[in-house]
Amino acid sequence: MKLSPVFTSIALALTCSSTSVLAKDFIPIETFPEWFKTAMSRSIDVTKESDFSLASVAAKGKVKGEISLVDESEGTWYYHIDIGTPTPVECYVFNEYDGPANSLHAIVDLSLNGAAELNGKTRSAQFNYAIDTGVIGNTPYLQLDTLYHLGEGEEKVAGMIKAYSAQTNDTLEICVHNELGYRDIFFDVFSSFVNTFNSEPADAPFFESVYEMRINDIPMGFAVEKYTKDADGDVMIESETALLVPVDANTVSRTDSADISWSRPDGSLINGSTYTIDNGVLSSEFEISVADDKWHVEGQIQGKAVSADLAHDGWLLSDFGSYLETADLIKRDAESAQFKMWTPDADPVSAISITLSKVTGNEDANMKIDMGPMVLDFYAEDNGIFKHGVMAQGPINIFMKSIYTQG
């Protein structure tokens, strides 16, 4: 399994201490006046469907509501979907983007500015209302709902931007709805829109997994892994992570990362590359490969160039190899095994020592990974596939759970 999301989650959890007291809906509905409760309970049954296609990205299918193209530019398409409410659902398609977390936040901010301009009032306050994650078929999504106030005093008005994002193949879909209530139908419309982009890629992965990630009881995002073999039997590993973590009542920290690496059939690393975007800024990017019989790393972190040889010049375990070694240890009489891995989120210029051990007496875990001061307890099936795990850091627990597996 990919360890980078675990390190990233820990770093975010330790810096965003307020998350320990939050929940999925951060503001209890009971604290609002009756008119707000009534508005939030609104629903509508949308039976109409419309045909949708976008040939340039091979999208085609039925969308709930009546969809129409409003605007397009190079690599961007903007649609309205009429669902019978005063405000239409707005959907964007991008083929260039920062990621599901950063781009979702940017579109929400754009929508908040648009609401202020439309009403001729300044944005006077905003609050994180809800964050969630899940899957539509095999496609993970993020949810970010934002309660906002415009104006001051007796002129103050309230509203809510509901928003979802999902990445499908080479495009990112984001939908927003500036209406109180209608939460269920908005998700149904978004799901139908996303499903039109879910065509099977030419080189389908032989294994794919999506993990939900939580801090205590707070949904914070997802991690995706895809494994594809080439003609020589080598394995390409594609992994992506998208995280939204509340910093306080008004703001969220955003992280998107993407990795591509190659593994030999025996689980040894060939090479790899990774990048991370934090809060709209490319915070790091690295590549690792063998040069002159040494592992060499090139890249940058916070704009500072990095070029170094690892002190370790031996075998490195790939993410694919971690599955193989887990399955092997489960079958053997041995209690533990040690490896070296390149985990740039922990240290980009070092090979991290990993100890994989069996766990007994714990109904929720049969294995654990020791990474220095951090320990991940997890449950793996006999074939090595990770099902769920937890890492404790003081009062904070980082949970990972498989919510989709294929292969």
Task: Indicate residue ranges for each PLM-predicted region.
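Gram-negative bacterial Sec-dependent N-terminal signal peptides
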Residues: M1-L22
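Cleaved targeting-peptide boundary
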Residues: L22-I29, F207
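N-terminal mature ectodomain segment of secretory-pathway/periplasmic proteins
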Residues: T38-W77, P219-G299, G384
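Surface-exposed amphipathic alpha-helical segments
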Residues: V57, N169-P205, K401-G407
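Conserved polar/disulfide-associated segments of primarily extracytoplasmic proteins
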Residues: V70-M160, A166-H177
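Solvent-exposed helix/loop surface patches that form functional interfaces
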Residues: I83-S124, D188-V189, P201-E212, I218-M220, ...
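Generic short beta-strand segments
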Residues: D145-H149, V210, E238-V245
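Short, exposed beta-strand-loop hairpins at the edges of beta-sheets
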Residues: D377-E381, I385-I396
